[in-house]
């Protein structure tokens, strides 16, 4: 077995490249359930996308490596769309169109076997300690009133999670995928862009709504909900923006 190379790190798991595979190693035995659920979710998405132009790394095994629960899948070589955007800003419009086409293709898949995005958001909002019970009630009431769909939602769709190489287009990091409303997933992507690449956020939302025929106001109705769901991560640098979005529920 060759030496492993760190690719990414988080509070919950680290991702390594080893022997041509990407290995996600969870940091504590308490994450056994997260590991198994992420593997099941990935496998279901992998099966669903088999006839799509979107490719997904093949999952090979779930195991315990050095006492850590791990998921092993193909390591995909290539550049992320984020890298391509950074290196070729003159082609930003082309990449943004491609980005939206990929997301639209994801939303075209129906996933009745995945857990529901609404259920996940409900749990996240109920567990928040940073907002009062009245605000929670307003958010949960809004969430309950939103149309219920069973479309495939990535949950963390961003340019860094798309890899492009000579074989095609790969989308990675499916652990947060759920069945739900596509506009909730779009609102989530818009939020991620506002936090990490704000100059791209508005062009993305405008172009997505134009290409898909979706009302911008309909996507924006999800913003307080996705902001509340993000708040549970407890990132201090995000709190001001998220609380501002959550407060919109009072008068929207």
Where do the PLM segments sit?
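Conserved HxN/HPN-centered segment at the entrance to the catalytic loop
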Residues: 50-61
């Amino acid at each position: 077995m060759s030496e492993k190379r760190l690719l990414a790190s988080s509070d919950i798991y680290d991702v390594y490249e080893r022997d041509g595979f990407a290995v996600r190693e969870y940091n504590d035995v308490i994450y056994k359930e997260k590991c198994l659920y992420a593997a099941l979710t990935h496998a279901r998405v992998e099966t669903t996308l088999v006839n799509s132009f979107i490719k997904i790394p093949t999952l090979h095994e779930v195991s315990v490596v050095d006492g850590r629960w791990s998921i092993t899948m193909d390591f995909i070589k290539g550049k992320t769309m984020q890298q391509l955007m950074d290196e070729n800003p003159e082609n930003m419009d082309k990449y943004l169109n491609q980005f939206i086409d990929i997301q639209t293709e994801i939303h075209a898949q129906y996933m009745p076997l995945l857990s529901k995005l609404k259920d996940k958001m409900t749990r996240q909002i109920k567990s928040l300690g940073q907002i009062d019970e009245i605000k929670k009630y307003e958010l949960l009431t809004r969430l309950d009133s939103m149309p219920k769909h069973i479309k495939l939602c990535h949950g963390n769709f961003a340019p860094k999670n798309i890899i492009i190489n000579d074989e095609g287009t790969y989308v990675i990091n499916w652990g947060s995928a759920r069945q739900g409303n596509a506009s909730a997933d779009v609102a989530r992507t818009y939020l991620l862009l506002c936090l990490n690449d704000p100059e791209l956020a508005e062009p993305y939302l405008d172009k997505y709504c134009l290409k898909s025929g979706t009302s911008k106001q309909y996507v924006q109705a999800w913003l307080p909900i996705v902001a509340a769901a993000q708040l549970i991560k407890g990132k201090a640098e995000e709190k001001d923006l998220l609380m501002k979005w959550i407060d919109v529920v009072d008068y929207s």
